[in-house]
């Protein structure tokens, strides 16, 4: 099971952090930043979630959205850490993980150019970590209509990277499970789904 970890102070500009929530009736803080802080689990809460997962035989992991979160979650030593599409060109964070985190790194390629894909895989290869890298075909959107899923990208990723990385996966942002079955049939060995 995968959670998410963000450091709002690192991700938001001062102006964004201090702006009022766009829908104050749904806000958990006086500002948008305070609202985001309220929604985040602390590192101690993540440690507790990891413990509960392990007690019932589930692998715990977290998507990290910034350097602070990457360092905090790496300290918990999960089996894998996920890099969301929105952060996959945060090369300083990727380098830090290559240098300081020994587990598997799963990374989505939504919103990523082919040149960026090559740069990312090359970074992991140059650091001797490509065989710890799982890359995911992903169409960024919630929910993604079936016609926009771009499943055949799995074939392209397999052709280009299957022998260079640990695995090719599929990150589904669609409704239902039919697309997951098709992704598996096309060779995605890991299927990631979003429940919330």
What are these regions (language model features)?
Residues 1-196:
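Catalytic cores and adjacent flexible loops of soluble metabolic enzymes
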